Swiss-Prot record:
InterPro entries: PQQD, PqqD_bac, PqqD_sf. The gene is pqqD. This is PqqA binding protein. One of its GO terms (biological process) is pyrroloquinoline quinone biosynthetic process. Keywords: PQQ biosynthesis. Monomer. Interacts with PqqE. Gene3D superfamilies: Coenzyme PQQ synthesis protein D (PqqD). Pathway: Cofactor biosynthesis; pyrroloquinoline quinone biosynthesis. GO terms for molecular function: quinone binding. The keyword 4Fe-4S does not apply. Belongs to the PqqD family. Functions as a PqqA binding protein and presents PqqA to PqqE, in the pyrroloquinoline quinone (PQQ) biosynthetic pathway. Pfam families: PqqD (PF05402).
Length: 94
């Protein structure tokens, strides 16, 4: 996805019934939902950990850029995560 300021102005929040947490048995962060669980990779877990219903996508990207200043494709990675999570109904974008 190409950088889209309108898209990045949206605020992600976990869809009702979905919860992000660390799952010790999986030794990973997961998204829990009524029908099961999705194990996240490290990158997705970093992004998911910043979804709080208050930060915009742009703010999440800025926060991650502070932690990882030498990753130029980070913004595109966040955009792709948000698009995929929205399509799978993990998150709502408001």
């Amino acid at each position: 996805m190409k950088h889209d300021p309108q898209f990045r102005a949206l605020t992600p929040k976990w869809h009702q019934g979905y919860r992000f947490q660390y799952e010790p048995a999986q030794k990973a962060h997961v998204v829990l939902y009524p029908e099961g669980m999705i194990k996240l990779n490290e990158s997705a877990a970093l992004i998911g950990g910043l979804i709080d219903g208050k930060r915009t996508i742009a703010a999440i990207i800025d926060e991650l850029h502070q932690q990882f200043p030498n990753v130029p494709e980070l913004g595109m990675d966040v955009d792709e995560f948000m698009e995929g999570a929205k399509k799978k109904n993990w998150i709502d974008l408001v």
